[in-house]
UniProtKB/Swiss-Prot annotation:
GO terms for molecular function: beta-N-acetylhexosaminidase activity. Glycans are attached at residues 44, 348, 409, 457. Transmembrane segments: none annotated. One of its GO terms (biological process) is N-glycan processing. It is found in: Lysosome. Belongs to the glycosyl hydrolase 20 family. This is Beta-hexosaminidase A. It comes from the Eukaryota. The lineage of its organism: Eukaryota, Metazoa, Ecdysozoa, Nematoda, Chromadorea. The active site is at 322 (proton donor). Its main location: other. Residues 1-15 form the signal peptide. Keywords: Glycoprotein, Glycosidase, Hydrolase, Lysosome, Signal. CDD domains: GH20_HexA_HexB-like.
Amino acid sequence: MRLIVLSLLFTSTLAWFYGRDEPDRWSVGGVWPLPQKIIYGSKNRTLTYDKIGIDLGDKKDCDVLLAMADNYMNKWLFPYPVEMKTGGTEDFIITVTVKEECPGGPPVHGASEEYLLRVSVSEAVINAQTVWGALRAMETLSHLVFYDQKSQEYQIRTAEIFDKPRFPVRGIMIDSSRHFLSLNVIKRQLEIMSMNKLNVLHWHLVDSESFPYTSQKFPELHGVGAYSPRHVYSREDISEVIAFARLRGIRVIPEFDLPGHTSSWKGRKGFLTECFDEKGEETFLPNLVDPMNDANFDFLAEFLEEVTETFPDQFLHLGGDEVSDYIVECWVRNKKIRKFMDEKGFGNNTVLLENYFFEKLFSIVEKLKLKRKPIFWQEVFDNNIPDPNSIIHIWKGNTHEEIYEQVKNITSKNFPVIVSACWYLNYIKYGADWRDEIRGTAPSNSRYYYCDPTSFNGTDTQKNLVLGGIAAIWGELVDNTNIEARLWPRASAAAERLWSPAEKTQKAENAWPRMHELRCRLVSRGYRIQPNNNPDYCPFEFDEPPATKSEL
């Protein structure tokens, strides 16, 4: 009896210390992100591999749905490393009905992802307007499937679900300039994105450190700017990523940051300004575009035409952040630039020179043959005169309240916004930062689950201008070896915030049993998903392939 009492006392003390319950408390057949409306039935249905099928109806030739059926039937519905039972008594057919035709290209902004899913003991029925909605429904259905340890059987919960996303933009930003990311690693993140119902990959392709994008028209860019000839993405590589993303209902938005963060563009002669230190000596690292040279704008026009031919998405991210970090060295101390400013009547006002550059860039974007809606980081709004057609990408704010004030200010000027400031996942501290405020970090760099981009005092018109959010993972200390575990499941907190109803997702303590089940589900599917709720375990843990004999 004494041992039992001590054990109970120790367990409850741990629960208090970690701020959570027992480490095996997870939901069973819980859906992540939480649907708009879900009603569970009272019965479960045993599933066996030989008695389950998918009926695509009149869309049986649609490549998106065929890939979906293959992925779920052969990998994701039955992910656990257990012997599959066969010989069920009745077939279980998943019937998929999609109203619109199978699209030939990737999803477009605002495409419907709404679906209705009904699961009974005899069948499952999916109804969706688009194939993208059907993809989301199938992922939800897979969350209803669980492995019962006692009966050693796969079962599915019966349920009726109506669902659609809260925001049209729900994404991840990856940075392949600071550290090159392989195609396989990028594809793995796309798979996990689809399992979290995220639909935008913001690809920060180039930055000061390297230029891995292969330009067919201007091969000198990657020829000089890439880390090595191996650290590049060919047009075929990019097309492969876009095609892979499409089959999972994900758009790919490229970013080419201008006019700063451009050291790696050094292969283009005359594109960058000369920069000088306090003694007037030229520095080795120019990092701003030379706005004096009209040939640079001709080059950008041709270069961006090529980019739009490579990336089909209607959004194009053109950066615009942190220009002020380089202005003194590269513009103020540059005598040629100062003379140009005098000739233009700008005096000492470098903001006017920035405006000059951006006006030229806006004109280039407006004249693109394949029309694009530009996205800019928020400095272009804060310091300059943004094109009225622009989307403003918010990355600043030390608290959630400061972030909300930024959103309020920008939307009050009638600009649509995308929010990333809440979810900078490259910042790491010890603890469950998805739900807790972590000591030593700004609140915006923790408590990811609690950031709601529309939690500001504004009009409905303003709140409708909030397109959604993108969780960012900057690459200074992130590469192929750690991006997956660092992203997931922390990005899953943002995924639920951007998909699910705000009023139903107010408390992380109510969400973490579902997140625990999500983590274990993804681990069983073969992904490196780090612990997120302090001490816990999964029924089937992640494992590496066995060592070869030579390693023993």
